Amino acid sequence: MKTILITGATSGIGLATAKKFANEKNRLILCGRRQHKLDEISNEISKITNVLTLRFDVSDKKEVNKVLENLPKEFSSIDILINNAGNAHGLDTIQEGSLDDWDNMIDSNVKGLLYVSRVIIPKMIEQNSGHIINIGSLAGREVYEKGNIYCATKHAVNAISKAMRIDLNKTGIKVSEINPGLVETDFSNVRFKGDNNRAEKVYLGYKALQADDIADIIEFVINRPSHVNIADILVLPQAQATSSIINKK
């Protein structure tokens, strides 16, 4: 049984991954900001395996430290960290973008990943093992119109993942980055601030990736032999060639 910590576990890729690993009887630490969602997930998953839910905002470094430095003994030895929390806010030109949107993306996508990792990595070093999965994006490989700051945050995730592999090379800790293209989740609804019609149009006319597709990939990456590290995966829907070229019918 492995102990797996997942940030952003209340929806989308995080939730799909939590359910997949629960069915494999892993011990789960599920983190998110919405207590009612955490309660719903806990009620479902606790029937299958041991689960601990933690409500905190990854962008609040004091809260991150307080919560993760005081884990119950049963959950204190973390084998796998899945840095999934993050989102996009707005789709505007750089001259018209909202500073609050920029802060939200930088705080969650970059700082949040770093704050959580900074607490967990020393624990992994002590046990001389561990696996960090950073959820990046196709947006970390290219830049698309009006994607400016979101793309910048995902380029940062790519750089951080590479830096982690260098810094942790002698520790026995694996670092993997998974970079999806378009995945049909609440992502666009959050980006467009509840404009459901606009969000739904993002996924019309083609088959987008599903959260379960990414959960399957995470499972594959984690279950490789100890000498194998899948460092980097880019996965797109068949209909998607780049961030802006999508074969819609």
Where would I find each of the regions flagged by the language model?
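Substrate-binding pocket helix/loop in short-chain dehydrogenase/reductase
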Residues: D92-I94, D101-I106
